[in-house]
């Protein structure tokens, strides 16, 4: 494995791990950083699937007690059954819209200008949601009903626009629909499991021919491990952070980063308009 290729794999593994579960858009950061370091083409498509699996494994491991508790409790515990139903209800809207529009969105919207615009708009919405007074109806994920799940699932569909952020849309959706900050964040993590596994499986099947080159295995392995490690650090850090802070810091980061991309484009510093994810 070439040194620069290993460095690219490491950088993008770090980016995926740190941004996947923070409300700042992992896809948006991947598109922008990959373009800056010149990592693209078919190898990049396959690589992105692999590093997403690393991030998924991290959140499953971090919440393993809850995950295994739900699985073991499904046959007999109403709480586990209700939680599973809520998760499936929240997952379905993304499945329907993803199958219908994924290719169109990837073709037309996977570029840094769309990402930057979505980062700014999403940041403004996040600030509004945090400052808006709302009554907390749900303090823990086990208190949710199917209506909460459906609304959050619909909010997650906004994340099909790169730069919006899957975790950002579900967390802010949860806050607006009556969940506490902790409950909204945890449900976002749980919802990521079926959503990301489904997306990775769909993309993996669609691009299955890209995995026939065994020479890329060391690159994929490095990206997977790095993504897993940094995703676990990000999940733990976010849970500690939101215990005593709002999401305003992430909102301002989104706005600043998005405006920086748009400014460099307008000034001609970087020709983002021709870049593709």
UniProtKB/Swiss-Prot annotation:
It is found in: Cell inner membrane. It catalyses: di-trans,octa-cis-undecaprenyl diphosphate + H2O = di-trans,octa-cis-undecaprenyl phosphate + phosphate + H(+). One of its GO terms (molecular function) is undecaprenyl-diphosphatase activity. One of its GO terms (biological process) is response to antibiotic. Keywords: Antibiotic resistance, Cell inner membrane, Cell membrane, Cell shape, Cell wall biogenesis/degradation, Hydrolase, Membrane, Peptidoglycan synthesis, Transmembrane, Transmembrane helix. Pfam families: BacA. The keyword Cell membrane applies. Bacitracin is thought to be involved in the inhibition of peptidoglycan synthesis by sequestering undecaprenyl diphosphate, thereby reducing the pool of lipid carrier available. Belongs to the UppP family. Catalyzes the dephosphorylation of undecaprenyl diphosphate (UPP). Confers resistance to bacitracin. This is Undecaprenyl-diphosphatase. It comes from Azotobacter vinelandii (strain DJ / ATCC BAA-1303).
């Amino acid at each position: 494995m070439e040194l620069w290729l290993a460095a690219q794999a490491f950088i993008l593994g770090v980016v995926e791990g740190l941004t996947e579960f923070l409300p700042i858009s992992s896809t948006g950061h991947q598109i922008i950083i990959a373009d800056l370091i010149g990592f693209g083409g078919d190898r990049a498509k396959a690589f992105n699937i692999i590093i997403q699996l690393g991030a998924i494994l991290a959140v499953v491991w971090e919440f393993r007690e809850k995950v295994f508790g739900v699985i073991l409790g499904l046959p007999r515990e109403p709480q586990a059954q209700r939680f599973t139903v809520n998760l499936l209800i929240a997952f379905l809207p993304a499945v329907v819209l993803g199958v219908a529009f994924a290719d169109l969105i990837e073709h037309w919207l996977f570029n840094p200008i769309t990402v930057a615009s979505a980062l700014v708009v999403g940041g403004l919405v996040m600030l509004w949601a945090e400052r808006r007074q709302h009554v907390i109806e749900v303090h823990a994920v086990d208190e949710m009903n199917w209506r909460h799940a459906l609304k959050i699932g619909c909010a997650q569909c906004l994340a099909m626009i790169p730069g919006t952020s899957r975790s950002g849309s579900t967390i802010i959706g949860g806050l607006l629909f009556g969940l506490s900050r902790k409950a909204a964040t945890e449900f976002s993590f749980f919802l990521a499991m079926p959503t990301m596994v489904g997306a990775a499986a769909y993309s993996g099947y669609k691009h299955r021919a890209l995995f026939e080159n065994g020479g890329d295995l060391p690159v994929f392995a490095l990206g997977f491990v790095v993504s897993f490690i940094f995703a676990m650090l990000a999940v733990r850090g976010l849970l500690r952070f939101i215990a005593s802070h709002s999401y305003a810091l992430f909102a301002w980061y989104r706005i600043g980063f998005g405006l920086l991309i748009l400014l460099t484009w307008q000034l001609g510093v970087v020709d983002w308009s021709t870049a593709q994810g």
